[in-house]
Amino acid sequence: MQGALEAILKRFITIGRVTVHWPDGRTTRYGAAPDFPTQPAPTPGHGGFAQDVGFQIRDARTIRHILFDPELAVGEALADGRVVPVGCTLYDLFDLIVRNYRANAGVHPVGRLRNLLGRAARRLHQYNPATRSRRNVAHHYDLNGRLYSLFLDRDRQYSCAYFATGSETLEEAQSAKKHHIAAKLCLDRPGLHVLDIGCGWGGMALTLARDYGARVTGITLSSEQLFEARARTASEGLDHLVTFELLDYRALADRTPHRRFDRIVSVGMFEHVGIGHFDAFFEAVGRALHPDGVALLHAIGRTHGAGHTSPWITKYIFPGGYCPALSEVLPPIERSGLIATDIEILRLHYAETIRHWRRRFAANRDTIAAIYDDRFCRMFELYLVASELAFRHESHMVFQIQLARSQTATPLTRDYIPSAKHRAVFSTTENSRF
């Protein structure tokens, strides 16, 4: 088994050099000696990539698992401590591995076969009826509430921030994201009723109410998020403007068949819908949106067409999740009768967001390990590293799609966006009229 993995590594490592410490005590180097300069930073605050990395495999059983199912086994072995980085960070190790994967996966027959099988099985993995969706959400979002306060910003924005210059703090960039979205919602007057699908801990809803005078109904499938969102609303004295419900988007028509919302926003929730449910999602948005209303969808997408979710991510992080390509999202939008009035692609913004999360997680690692354990920390660190690299290496991005039912619902050009970002002039006192 070890010989088979050695043969694969010899062919696979064509960029940089990887040193492997085997269970039998031998050490083998693969690839060329690092004699070329590091690449320039793609964004502010991020250096070049490591060219010489290493790892140790601590038992022969792990080798068998990696050969049988590398996408799942490597993540499990790193989380268990059966594979450990040597002479480098986890980020450095994965960065070089991902670069080699990108260079070789498309031409290697095993890589092509794995991609085909993954795509064939994705509808099964993403079958998310209402009951399963609730369990999937609880798996990730109903963790100990302290965890998220230890690496997210103060507002607990668990989605891509907006870095206009790259020098912003996480708090500044997350605030900019919310106002960027608010501008696209065309909140041109107070009292507009907004539906927030997948409201998280309530940060977006509270911002729209506090700064724009909107009335907001937020829905979530997470009991922990619902509790926190309601508590925050009460503490800010915004109960008269903001309400939160434990509700699936598919149940909106049954709960309020005649209600229409002036605006609808969904941030970081669409990734949990599943490809077989895209039509149902956009049909629900279309039914709930006022004829002159505006909706904004903010979600992670793929840059190179349809794909499949890593089995490790599916098993341990986001069961039922999938980040679609635009080519998979636009057809169900068209079938729903909605009009895509604007599309913006945010490329490296999420890489920078996750870099901030990784640093905060590392700074609070001892506290998090006391809440959970070291294995959980290794698992979560791997999730953050892998996610950041997916955006840095151009396989993932974030799209914001503005939707409407009428061609005249939004301005003719984008010129309104900068001024609309600064329209947050309604104080909490002024909002009390609505």
What are these regions (language model features)?
Residues P190-G198:
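Conserved class I S-adenosyl-L-methionine
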Residues R250-I264:
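A short acidic, Gly/Pro-enriched loop at the edge of an enzyme's catalytic core
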Residues D279-P291:
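A short glycine-rich, Lys/Arg-flanked "PGG" loop and its adjoining helix->strand segment in the class I
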Residues W201-Y212:
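Conserved SAM-binding loop of SAM-dependent methyltransferases across substrates and taxa
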Residues I300-P411, P418:
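Substrate-binding/catalytic lobe of Class I Rossmann-like enzymes that use SAM or dcSAM, i.e.
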Residues M1-Q174, H180, L187:
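Feature captures hydrophobic
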